[in-house]
């Protein structure tokens, strides 16, 4: 009876389950998305206080302004604080931060759909939502730390 030698099992060099490696294009995509969803929310959040890029108050739906206490300007301070926190969570725990950013983007999209003339911005934010979901999927492979350690 002939004996066969089994070939060693190797993983594909771009398997997301492998150790993080900067030569791995899947890991590179994770790094790019993580950096983008760390920096952008923090910068946009800070700008809610400074108004350097734009007057953010115009992006707050008048319907919501009637419901939320205070003015649109005051609401944007809260929005800015939430965005800064979201960016920091992505930096520290991308698996959970990406879900926070995705949920936040859904809220932004709904808000923009309530303002006539901002549908193009809502569509762009939908693209960002999809990228945040992609970051969550990649973080599931590369950020395997549990939320709470025992």
What residue spans do the PLM features occupy?
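Membrane-interface extramembranous regions
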Residues: 2-150
